[in-house]
A protein has these predicted regions:
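Conserved catalytic-core segment of nucleotide-activated headgroup transferases in glycan assembly
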Residues: 2, 6-98
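Glycosyltransferase donor-binding loop in the core domain
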Residues: 12, 34-37, 111, 146, ...
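Acidic donor-binding loop of glycosyltransferase active sites
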Residues: 82, 97-111, 122-125
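Flexible glycine-rich beta->alpha loop in the catalytic core of nucleotide-sugar glycosyltransferases
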Residues: 90, 107-109, 125, 131-134, ...
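Short hydrophobic beta-strand element within catalytic cores of glycosyltransferases
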Residues: 115-119, 125-129
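Short acidic/histidine- and often glycine-rich active-site loop of Leloir-type glycosyltransferases
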Residues: 130-147
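Conserved acidic donor-binding segment of nucleotide-sugar-dependent glycosyltransferases
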Residues: 144-152, 160-165
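A short, well-ordered alpha-helix in the C-terminal region of glycosyltransferases
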Residues: 160, 167-181, 188-194
Length: 199
């Protein structure tokens, strides 16, 4: 019966509220590190973008949060005290929610990126490449995220989130509201009970 069918697209868990405080020096990347596109994005950030941030913010720290990091990703933390590789974490929100900004400089296409939605659903603003933004039509640079492709512009956007609390909190709130409205499981499954009752 077609009336008993429903389509549920991609969704993520959203926090009930945006955290009141955050670590101004913490930048994070969220994603399963066994995938090529995530490894490539992290290496691109570490090699080409993070050094530009460290010139202005020598205390900045980059957290690579995700299961199954290969040896070359693990080695990044051994080479720099400013880089932390967490590997798998039991409670993702505990590792992500206090970040000042999340980054997604993805250069290899891979559909909708949960890494972006997860961070935004925790109230963490995201700086991302235009490639990754194309999979999420509700995104608007400067409103609910920041979209940059050039290395210096990407670094500058991260620095702005670290330096300008009002701007950071504005994008944090808008991003959180966007994900909660369009991509949260809470919203997507709100009609499930009605569907089940009618079956």
């Amino acid at each position: 019966d077609k009336h008993s069918l429903a389509l549920y697209t991609n969704g993520v868990e959203c926090m009930d509220e945006i955290p009141d405080s955050y670590d101004h020096d913490k930048i994070c990347f969220v994603g399963n590190m066994r995938t090529l596109q995530n490894q490539d994005a992290v290496l691109h950030f570490v090699n080409d973008i993070f050094p530009l941030i460290l010139k202005k913010k020598p205390g900045a720290r980059f957290y690579i949060i995700g299961a199954e990091p290969p040896r070359n990703i693990m080695a990044l933390a051994e080479k720099s005290e400013n880089i932390v590789v967490t590997g798998f974490v039991d409670v993702l929100s505990d590792a992500v929610k206090d970040s000042c900004v999340a980054v997604a400089p993805v250069q290899i296409a891979a559909g909708i990126q949960n890494k972006v939605l997860v961070a935004m659903g925790m109230g963490v603003p995201v700086v991302m490449s235009s490639l990754i933004s194309k999979a999420i039509p509700e995104l608007e640079s400067g409103t609910n995220c920041i979209i940059e492709d050039a290395d210096q512009a990407f670094a500058d956007a991260c620095l702005r989130m670290m330096d300008n609390e009002a701007d950071r909190n504005r994008i944090s709130r808008s991003g959180y509201d966007t994900v909660r409205k369009y991509y949260s499981w809470q919203e997507k499954l709100s009609g499930y009970d009605h569907l089940n009752a009618d079956s």
